[in-house]
């Protein structure tokens, strides 16, 4: 009888330790890679990229990046590779708007839109194609 109690206690303690060790892992905050390309699938340099919440008309809307919080929206510009990388605090769904001003090769403003669906432990990779026909509402 004593032997059964000892075996039961050892098994219970082992299972309890396994549950505690395995259940305490914090999720990795979501990350995103946004790629801006033209209609020829070439990267776009100096495109203005705005990330904002779906209901960004509210003055209380925030975008929670890993190291800072921005009111309503965050604006950055792409480098020559057309890529921007972000780290966020929370899972969320955000709108992405990209705009490239007119230049010698393209006499019209080009725009594109996309959506980031951010999940913990994942890096979301989104490619947004900009063109002359896209209109922001």
Locate predicted features.
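Sec-dependent bacterial lipoprotein signal peptides
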Residues: 1-22
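A short, amphipathic beta-strand motif
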Residues: 32-38
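Short Pro-Gly-centered beta-turn/loop motif in secreted/extracellular proteins
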Residues: 80-95
